[in-house]
């Protein structure tokens, strides 16, 4: 990774797009403190995050939904949700938050006592996102949320992300599904072989004839 500079403003839905191996997930992992950069700065609300442990970063309001969802299959839906609330240490709000997640994600509300591993792929993705929202994040980072899902479930995931954005959630989205991503985001950065190739408003990028070739690792 080199010369990667990006910004997400409050209330925005911003995408980081690019081919496999471009470094998209590495950027999210660095922001979350999972990967330690050897140089550069990462700042959130004016505070430098470099050197902080992942749990410290989470307590500052950054939540990461990793590629592959990362739910605990042997735990119930409610137990998975409870894990998402640990950074807040506010048991009095827990019940209200579960009710809110049940409203946002009705299928989860119906299956609170069901093991997470018995849910479908799309339902597990909903659970992973709901678990992250239990922390009341100021920034929600989603890493390849549509990966491995059937087309109908991909539609549901993008509708969910769009709905979260419209409700005021600030989101940094990593995705390979460029067309669908540019339909819902405010802005996007195109990452190519470890550096930002271009950036701009979603509408501008959709009109760029060379986006597909750069996305595939070439030059348009």
Tell where the protein language model's regions lie, with residue ranges.
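Glycine-rich phosphate-binding loops of nucleotide-dependent enzymes
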Residues: 1-220
């Amino acid at each position: 990774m080199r010369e990667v500079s990006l910004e997400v403003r409050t209330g925005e839905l911003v995408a980081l797009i690019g081919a496999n191996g471009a470094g998209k997930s590495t950027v999210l992992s660095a922001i979350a403190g999972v990967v330690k950069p050897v140089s550069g700065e990462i700042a959130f609300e004016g505070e430098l995050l470099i050197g902080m442990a992942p749990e410290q970063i989470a307590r500052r309001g950054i939540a990461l939904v990793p590629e592959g969802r990362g739910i605990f299959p042997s735990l119930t839906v409610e137990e998975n949700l409870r894990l998402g609330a640990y950074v807040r240490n506010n048991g009095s709000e827990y019940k209200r938050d579960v009710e809110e997640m049940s409203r946002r994600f009705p299928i989860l509300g119906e299956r609170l006592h069901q093991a997470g591993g018995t849910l479908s792929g799309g339902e597990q993705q909903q659970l992973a996102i709901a678990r992250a929202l239990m922390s009341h994040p100021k920034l929600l980072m989603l890493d390849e949320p549509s990966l491995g899902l059937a087309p109908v479930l991909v539609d549901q995931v993008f509708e969910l992300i769009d709905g979260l954005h419209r409700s005021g959630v600030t989101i940094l989205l990593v995705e390979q599904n460029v067309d669908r991503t540019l339909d819902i985001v405010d802005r996007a950065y195109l990452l190519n072989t470890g550096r930002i190739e271009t950036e701009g408003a979603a509408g501008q990028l959709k009109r760029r004839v060379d986006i597909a070739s750069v996305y595939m690792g070439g030059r348009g």
